Design a protein with these regions (language model features):
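Local pocket/hinge segments that shape ligand/substrate recognition
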Residues: 32-33, 43, 65-170, 186-188, ...
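Append "and occasionally in soluble cytosolic enzymes with long acidic Gly/Pro-rich linkers
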Residues: 106-218, 318, 360, 364, ...
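Ligand-site clamp/hinge motif
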Residues: 31-72, 222, 673-698, 704-706
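Aromatic- and charge-enriched surface segment that lines or borders ligand/interaction sites
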Residues: 50-58, 101-113, 117, 434-499
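Extracytoplasmic/peripheral linker and loop segments enriched in polar/acidic and small residues
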Residues: 112, 124-127, 224-233, 263-342, ...
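Long beta-strand-rich cores associated with HINT superfamily self-processing modules
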Residues: 266, 341-382, 394, 649-650, ...
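Surface-exposed binding/hinge segments that line
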Residues: 503-623, 647, 652, 657-659, ...
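Periplasmic binding protein-like
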Residues: 51-66, 75, 218-276, 475
Length: 834
C-alpha cells in the first residue's frame, strides 16, 4: 500500500497541518508561480486506456506506472515521452492476532516461513518484466542505508523453497495442536481458513495474491479471497480490529513522494507498533501488535538518540533484524516504474523517488493551451486531512501542488533545502548546551496557556527560522498566529494520554509525542522570525532544521474548527479511530465534512470565539471575525474546506465524474515565479563511456583499468569472483572525465582462476543515481591465454538490471545517509499507500 512514505510526519514540522478551507479568491491578480492556469485530474483505472489517451493527446500525462511490455519498441512509444523512476515496492502484511479463533499467523515461525513461500525472483522477472529487484527488508536497492544492513539481510539467505516452507509451517501447526485431515489442516475439528485481501485494482498485486493463495491451499489451508481497492482496504484491513480476523494477509504496495538523504521513519513505519502503522494501529479498543524491542530501537533512530553515523547504523541493523524475524510485514520486491507523457508537454521533472508525479512537474510543466489534463489511477481513496489523512499516494500527489512546505528535499540529492523558511542553527554536538532565552515560551496543557520556560534552561540545538509568508488561498495573509496554533496543536495532541483525554488520536499522537518530548521552548522574534530550542541533534544540519521546522500549510481557523469537530465526536482525524467509534474519517474535500467545518466557524464568529492558544497575542475582534468570514465564504463558494498556500488552489472535486480541478493561484504575492524549478528539468546524470580491461589477465601481475566518464565526480568499483564474493572494492576520483583503477599484484592474485566480474559505478555529487558498467574477465595462473570464452559486458542506467551493487554505491556516496521519500513537507517523510 504505498503509504508514502506521503503523509508528512510530524517531526515538529508544523508543516503537517494541512489546510482545507477556501474562500472565494478576490478578483484582483498578483504574482503567479506556474506556467499553466488549470490542471484537471481524471481517474483512469485501466493503464492501457490511459496510455492510448496520452498517445492521442487527450491526456497530457499519466500519474501511474505503465507496464513495460506496452512500451517495448519504437512504435509503441510514438507521440510519447517515457520516463523511468524507482520508488515503489510490494509487501505482504500479516495479521498476527492471537485473539479469537485460531490464527496460524499468530505464530512467528509460520509468518517467517512465508519468506520461503513467496518467489521474489518470479515477481521481479515475470510480474514486473524484469524492471525491479527482490527485497528482504524495507530497505530496497535504492536506499542509502542498504550497505549498512547488507550483512543482516544477506544472513537470512531467503530462497524460494516451498518444501521448506511447508515443513516449517507443518511443524508449528502440529506443535499448536492442529491436525491434517484429508489434506486439510484442522484445529479443534474445524478447517483452518485464511482470508487474503487482494488488491484487484493492481494487476501485479492481484497476481501476487492469486499465487500466494494457491501455495497456501497446496499446503492444506482453506483460502478465502477478498478482493478490493485501497478504499476498501482502509476499512477491512487498516480500520478493523485484528481480533475480528476479517483478514489474515494483505497484498500491500508503497510509493515515494520525495527524496531524502537520511531516513528516521522507515523502520518505525514498517515494523514498530508505536508508529501506528502495524495491526491494531494503537487503537485502544483493538487488539494491538506489540514489540518493545522494535519500539525502543526505532524511537532512538527517529528522535536522533545516537552520536555518530556508525552508532545509527547499528541501531538500523538491530531494528532490521528484529523486523525481518518477526515478519509481520514481509517485503517482496521493488519496482522500476515507467511513466508516459505526451510529446507536446515540456518541463517534466522526473525526481528520484517520486518520479514524474513529483510536486515539481505540474508547477514547472508547460503546454500549448495553458492547461494540463493528468490521468490518475484513483481520484479518491482516503480522507483529506492534515493530521491523520492524506496517507495515500493519490491524494498526496495533488496536495503537493496545493501546499508549500517550509523546506523540501532536493529531488536529486535529498539534501534539505529552504522553500518558505530559511534557518540558522546553533549547536555544538549531541552534548551541546545552548542557553534558552528567558522569554522563551512553551504550551502548558494543564493551564491551557503559554508559559515562560524555567530559568537557566539549556537546549542541545537552537534554530532561528525566517518565515516567507504570503496569502492563503482564501485571500487572507498568513501570519505568526498560524505558526502559534500549529505549535499549540502539536503540543496539545502530542502530550501523554490522560484518562478521557479528548485531544488524543491513536495514529497522530504517538508520533507527535516524540517531537514534543524534545521541544524545550520557542521565542517569537518578530512578525516573521521565530527561535526554536530543542533537545535534538543530528550530524546533518538539514535534519535538525527539518525536525524543528515551524511552518503551517493550513490556516489556524480551519485547524481550530477541525479540532473542535473531533473533540465533539462528530468526526475523527484517523481512519482507525473513525472505525472504532463508528464516525466519519474527517475529509475536508468532502462537502459533508466541509459543512461541519463551516457550521463550527459560524459558531466561532457568532460567539466571538478566541482560541486559548492565541488570546495572549492577538486581541482584535475584527481580526478574528475577518478570519472566520473568509473561510466561511470559501466553503460556501467551493463546497470544500481545502485551503492552503501553494501555487495552485483546489477549484472543485466532482466524485460523479471522478475529477479534481486545480487552478493557478494568481492573487497576492506568491514568492516564486514560473520556472523556479527549471534547473531540475535537464539534470546531467553521470555516465561511463569506456572501460579498458583485458579479457584475460595474469594473477601474477598488477593491473591498470582506465575509465572515461561524463558528468561524474568519482568512480566506485567492485571486483568479485564467480561465487559472488567481493575480492576488492574502492573509490577513485575523476579528473577531467578520466579515472584509473590501480590493482596491485597482491589484489589480483586473489581472483579465482577463470571467470571474475568487474562492476564500476560513476557517481556525481549533484545526482544520487550512479551509472553502472559491468563486465566479465578471466584470470589465469600464468601469462598464457586461456581457451576462448564468451565475455559479457553490460552498461546500464536503469531498467532490467541487477541493482544489488548499485545500492552499495549509493550508500557509499552518501555515507550513513538514507535515500527516502520526503513528503511534501520538508520534514521527516513517510511512504504512502497505493
Amino acid at each position: 500500500m504505498i503509504k508514502l512514505l506521503l503523509r508528512q510526519l510530524i517531526k515538529f514540522k508544523v508543516i503537517f497541518i494541512i489546510a482545507v478551507l477556501f474562500f472565494a479568491i478576490p478578483s484582483s491578480f498578483g504574482d503567479k508561480g506556474t506556467f499553466v492556469d488549470e490542471i484537471k485530474f481524471i481517474q483512469y483505472l485501466d493503464e492501457n486506456t490511459a496510455l492510448q489517451e496520452v498517445r492521442n493527446g487527450n491526456l497530457d500525462l499519466y500519474y501511474f506506472r505503465v507496464s513495460s511490455d506496452r512500451l517495448e519498441d519504437y512504435n509503441s512509444r510514438e507521440n510519447l515521452q517515457v520516463f523511468e523512476s524507482t520508488g515503489s515496492y510490494y509487501s505482504i502484511l500479516t495479521n498476527p492476532t492471537d485473539s479469537g479463533k485460531f490464527n496460524p499467523f499468530s505464530i512467528k515461525e509460520i509468518r517467517f516461513a512465508l519468506n520461503y513461500l513467496v518467489d521474489r525472483n518470479l515477481i521481479v522477472n515475470e510480474l514486473l518484466g524484469g524492471f525491479g529487484s527482490p527485497m528482504i527488508s524495507n530497505y530496497g536497492v535504492f536506499s542509502a542505508d542498504y550497505l549498512g544492513i547488507l550483512d543482516v539481510t544477506e544472513s537470512f539467505q531467503f530462497r524460494y523453497n516451498t518444501s521448506l516452507a511447508d515443513q516449517m509451517i507443518s511443524d508449528e501447526l502440529e506443535k499448536a495442536g492442529a491436525k491434517k485431515i484429508n489434506g486439510i489442516w484442522n484445529f479443534d475439528n474445524e478447517p483452518i481458513e485464511i482470508t487474503i485481501f487482494i488488491r484487484s485494482d493492481d494487476p501485479v498485486r492481484k497476481s501476487i495474491g492469486e499465487i500466494l493463495s494457491f501455495q497456501l491451499e497446496s499446503i492444506g489451508f482453506i483460502v478465502k479471497k477478498d478482493f478490493g481497492d485501497l478504499n476498501k482496504a482502509y476499512v477491512v484491513v487498516y480500520g478493523s480490529d485484528p481480533a475480528e480476523q476479517k483478514w489474515n494477509l494483505y497484498t500491500e504496495a508503497w510509493s515515494s513522494t520525495g527524496f531524502s538523504r537520511y531516513d528516521s521513519i522507515a523502520l518505525a513505519q514498517m515494523y514498530a507498533p508505536w508508529f501506528s502503522n502495524m495491526p491494531g494501529n494503537n487503537t485502544p479498543s483493538y487488539w494491538n501488535y506489540q514489540n518493545e524491542i522494535l519500539d525502543n530501537v526505532t524511537q532512538n533512530i527517529y528522535s536522533g538518540n545516537f552520536e555518530t553515523a556508525d552508532e545509527r547504523t547499528l541501531l538500523i541493523k538491530d531494528a532490521t533484524k528484529e523486523g525481518v524475524n518477526e515478519s509481520v510485514r514481509i517485503f517482496l520486491a521493488s519496482k522500476v516504474d515507467q511513466y508516459v507523457v505526451n510529446e507536446n508537454i515540456t518541463g517534466i521533472i522526473n525526481a528520484l523517488g517520486a518520479g514524474v508525479p513529483s510536486r515539481f512537474t505540474p508547477i514547472n510543466a508547460s503546454s500549448n493551451d495553458g492547461s494540463l489534463v493528468i490521468g490518475v489511477k484513483q481520484i479518491y481513496q482516503g480522507a483529506w486531512n492534515p493530521i491523520a489523512g492524506l496517507g495515500d499516494i493519490y491524494s498526496n500527489q495533488i496536495w503537493g501542488i496545493l501546499s508549500d512546505p517550509g523546506m523540501y528535499g532536493h529531488p536529486f540529492t535529498g539534501k534539505i533545502i529552504p522553500l518558505r523558511t530559511t534557518w540558522n542553527i546553533e549547536t555544538n554536538g549531541s552534548h551541546s548546551s545552548i542557553p534558552v532565552h528567558d522569554d522563551a515560551i512553551i504550551w502548558n496543557t494543564k493551564t491551557q496557556s503559554w508559559n515562560t520556560v524555567e530559568s537557566d534552561l539549556t537546549a542541545i540545538s537552537k534554530i532561528t527560522f525566517d518565515l516567507n509568508f504570503s496569502q492563503w488561498h482564501n485571500g487572507q495573509n498568513m501570519d505568526i498566529n498560524d505558526i502559534l496554533y500549529s505549535i499549540y496543536f502539536l503540543t496539545e495532541w502530542g502530550s501523554e494520554k490522560d484518562v478521557n483525554d479528548k485531544t488524543y488520536d491513536s495514529h497522530f499522537s504517538p508520533q507527535a509525542v516524540q517531537n514534543v518530548n524534545s521541544l524545550v521552548g520557542f521565542r517569537i522574534i518578530d512578525d516573521d522570525t521565530i527561535e526554536v530550542y530543542t533537545n535534538y541533534w543530528h550530524f546533518d544540519d538539514g535534519q535538525i532544521a527539518s525536525w524543528a521546522g515551524t511552518w503551517s500549510t493550513t490556516p489556524w481557523e480551519i485547524m481550530s474548527a477541525m479540532e473542535k469537530s473531533v473533540i465533539d465526536g462528530k468526526v475523527s482525524f484517523s481512519r482507525s479511530d473513525a472505525v472504532s467509534k463508528n464516525i466519519n474519517w474527517l475529509s475536508l474535500i468532502v462537502p459533508r465534512d466541509a459543512k461541519i467545518i463551516h457550521d463550527i466557524l459560524e459558531d466561532f464568529k457568532q460567539s466571538e470565539y478566541v482560541p486559548s492558544s492565541l488570546n495572549q497575542f492577538e486581541t482584535s475582534n475584527a481580526y478574528y471575525e475577518n478570519r472566520y468570514n473568509q473561510s466561511i465564504n470559501w466553503i460556501e463558494e467551493y463546497d470544500h474546506a481545502v485551503i492552503s498556500n501553494g501555487p495552485f488552489y483546489l477549484e472543485r472535486y466532482s466524485p460523479e465524474s471522478r475529477t479534481i480541478v486545480t487552478k493557478s493561484f494568481d492573487y497576492g504575492d506568491y514568492p516564486f515565479p514560473p520556472g523556479k524549478w527549471h534547473e531540475y528539468e535537464q539534470i546531467k546524470f553521470p555516465k561511463i563511456t569506456s572501460v579498458e580491461i583485458d579479457e584475460v589477465i595474469s594473477k601474477n601481475s598488477s593491473v591498470k583499468i582506465p575509465i572515461l566518464t561524463k558528468n561524474s565526480s568519482e568512480i566506485h568499483y567492485f571486483l568479485s569472483n564467480s561465487r559472488g564474493q567481493i575480492i576488492s572494492e574502492g573509490k577513485v576520483s575523476v579528473n577531467e572525465n578520466n579515472s584509473i583503477i590501480n590493482l596491485d599484484s597482491e589484489t589480483v592474485s586473489k581472483f579465482d582462476t577463470g571467470a571474475n566480474t568487474l562492476k564500476v559505478f560513476a557517481a556525481s555529487n549533484d545526482v544520487l543515481r550512479p551509472y553502472e558498467y559491468s563486465t566479465s574477465f578471466l584470470a589465469s595462473e600464468t601469462d598464457t591465454s586461456l581457451p576462448n570464452v564468451e565475455i559479457t559486458t553490460t552498461l546500464s542506467e536503469s531498467g532490467q538490471t541487477d541493482y544489488s551493487f548499485l545500492v552499495i554505491v549509493i550508500a557509499l556516496i552518501i555515507g550513513a545517509g538514507i535515500i527516502f521519500i520526503i513528503k511534501t513537507r520538508s520534514k521527516r517523510t513517510q511512504k504512502t499507500t497505493i
